Amino acid sequence: MALITVKNVSFYYEKNMVVENLSFEVNAGDYLCVVGENGSGKSTLIKGLLRLKQPESGEIAIGDGLKANEVGYLPQQTAAQKDFPGGVYEVVLSGRLSSRGIRPFYTAKDKQIAKENMELLNISDLANRCYRELSGGQQQRVLLARALCATRKLILLDEPVSGLDPLVTQEFYGTVAQLNRNANITVIMVSHDIQSAVKYATHILHLQNEQAFFGKTEEYLRTTLAKSFIGGAENV
């Protein structure tokens, strides 16, 4: 059974259609990149997958043992978030909040999971640093470790490289790809960076306020839609 099944889903804001007729599946081990122009419904879809927004019609179902609170999420960073004064370890550990439930404290298991994910992303040496003093790339690694604390199955990333320089961007994409291949973490990523999307993703979902394409990356690259979109991105 698929981790996520989206069937005939449409989203509206104040009676205005944002995206409609979405039907696709995400299976364990997939790396799905969601692409499209601004306003095409990408971030709205992510909110729907996180159950922060209910679809006007259709159904989003989770399966294969995945629980609603076992989805790691890395949102776009705001300026205020980048200036968060807390420590790195504190930020990473907060990824266990959904698992903590009503307990007023973190368990030894929570703390161990946080340390393991910091080691996985090579940021253990930053544990005692202040988050806002880190570089943009370091901050994104911290937030990725935080997202992994919530799950061992699926992470959602919404424009995770926004504002990063090209070298750091490619390093971050490489890190996510390694998590997908080596740790069997399923990835759903919203990105404007179509070149990196087709380089790393196993599947592409292209939105144009509807489902313009969903399928394997190699199939997408053969479409007129992909050639037009990639060509346009190269000229930006």
Feature names for model-found ranges:
Residues 166-168:
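Helix N-cap at the start of a conserved alpha-helix in ABC-type nucleotide-binding domains
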Residues 130-134, 138:
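Conserved ABC ATPase signature
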Residues 204-216:
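H-loop (His-switch) and adjacent beta-strand-loop-beta switch element
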Residues 191-192:
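H-loop/switch region of ABC-family ATPase nucleotide-binding domains
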Residues 58-69:
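Conserved ABC transporter NBD signature motif
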Residues 155-158:
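Catalytic Walker B motif of ABC-type/P-loop ATPase nucleotide-binding domains
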Residues 93, 108-126:
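Conserved ABC ATPase "signature" region
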